[in-house]
Amino acid sequence: MASSNLLLEVQFLHIPSLSQKQANPLSCRKFSSLDWKQEIGLKKDVFFRCHGLLSSVCIDNVNDHAERSSEFHHYGVGTNLRARVKPMKQFGLSSDGPITENDEETNNEILHNLCSNGKLTDACKLVEVMARHNQVPHFPSCSNLVRGLARIDQLDKAMCILRVMVMSGGVPDTITYNMIIGNLCKKGHIRTALVLLEDMSLSGSPPDVITYNTVIRCMFDYGNAEQAIRFWKDQLQNGCPPFMITYTVLVELVCRYCGSARAIEVLEDMAVEGCYPDIVTYNSLVNYNCRRGNLEEVASVIQHILSHGLELNTVTYNTLLHSLCSHEYWDEVEEILNIMYQTSYCPTVITYNILINGLCKARLLSRAIDFFYQMLEQKCLPDIVTYNTVLGAMSKEGMVDDAIELLGLLKNTCCPPGLITYNSVIDGLAKKGLMKKALELYHQMLDAGIFPDDITRRSLIYGFCRANLVEEAGQVLKETSNRGNGIRGSTYRLVIQGLCKKKEIEMAIEVVEIMLTGGCKPDETIYTAIVKGVEEMGMGSEAVQLQKKLKQWKLLKEV
């Protein structure tokens, strides 16, 4: 549609099956949903006097002849109801037909069955017929119909049925309204959504947190930050409860789109309206700025928190520590920790994990281990994340003996080692060429019922190749293939080239076969390495013959 105003209009056209004599003379009039505010307060008898206006609502312009020509009793209507429905020929719901002879209860039972069977177009037609003949449609069925139409993106029909429901005295629930408002916001029809939001309160179904959050997010998505701020301020002035979740969402979005300074201004403005921020609201600002490294903005927010008599909590401290560790501001980290010890918010296991992880990433393993022991002194039990971080860092730094010792202690704690734990230590041992210890740990892992993954096997294979134990690497590849596990092509290449260098051509060819059966296509370098290995074994004629075969099979290019 050309604009959001056009969306607000519902065209009332002649129903295709009606003759000119049957059609209501007012049926071509347009009726805007902007007029809802005047209509919602009308009594039901006034609504019934308006039936001429609703006489020929064209709910569906889609070519759905099959659906329109269906009979009501085909949609699961009970035997008693069929008896009450007058006998009829094949007819469409776009015509009143004998339906006018049905009472309200009968038509509502038909409406319920149509909605239950997903016949939304027929249900829309029936609601229109009932409205034209002063029959009040079943409100729960209308709500379900509106939701169904909203799900299939038929907003014009959904809003039309919603209007009929409201003018009949029904009160749609908040979920129904929210579905329509959500779809309107997705399409960028903010004005229409705001009109519908205002109508919610007038109809006795006030907006909730989801309603407000949806509208505010939509405004920001379309670059209307100031409109969103004014909107929430107006809602507070009109008596809307100061929903803290909505307030937090608003402030975080203002911070994201307009900066911290504007967000703090909004905090001050909303406080005048009786909406006061809590530490959760402030934490959203701290978190946003920390993630972007805006430490000056963070300092400004912290100062604002303290100046208003609020205390930082554990979430605030942990967020600050995570940011400071990532920037390697270790003096500031120590300062924050000292403050935490002096308050009621002592460091938790999450706090220590942040510190240990940051120090390990900065390759300050000794300080990380100091914090690990400090953690134990404070009676703060490490979890598996703590152990995995320390063991991973030890293995990378070559402290494999210490890692094995810590791993042994871990078995007797409430945090038994897992796959990640074993992989870290096995990889460290393999990189140092300590394959005997790596294999021992590998078998311990299997005995504990922990199955290796591609990382485990790749660490072993690379370790064997570095230690010039290519045959053992080939055996691991065979075991992997027998279990149906995948291996990277680079791993196969490393083993094949290592076998060729050691003139283990038969085993190299066997690994190639494993590679092919595993669905991994070798490249030309692998075949070249095999030919070269055969030649170096003193079998020149065999190498030439093999090369010809490979070229014939188009596995090697002609030079």
Swiss-Prot record:
UniProt cross-references to InterPro entries, sorted A to Z: Pentatricopeptide_rpt, TPR-like_helical_dom_sf
UniProt PPR repeat ranges: 103-137, 138-172, 173-207, 208-242, 243-277, 278-312, 313-347, 348-382, 383-417, 418-452, 453-487, 488-522, 523-557
Matches recorded under PROSITE patterns: PPR (PS51375)
Organism domain of life: Eukaryota
UniProt keyword terms in alphabetical order: Repeat
Intrachain S-S bonds: none
Protein's UniProt keywords contain Lipid metabolism: no
Pfam families: PPR (PF01535), PPR_1 (PF12854), PPR_2 (PF13041)
Gene3D superfamilies linked: Tetratricopeptide repeat domain
Family under the similarity heading: Belongs to the PPR family. P subfamily.
NCBIfam families with a match to the protein in the record: PPR
Protein name, as recorded: Pentatricopeptide repeat-containing protein At1g08610
Naturally occurring in which organism (per UniProt): Arabidopsis thaliana
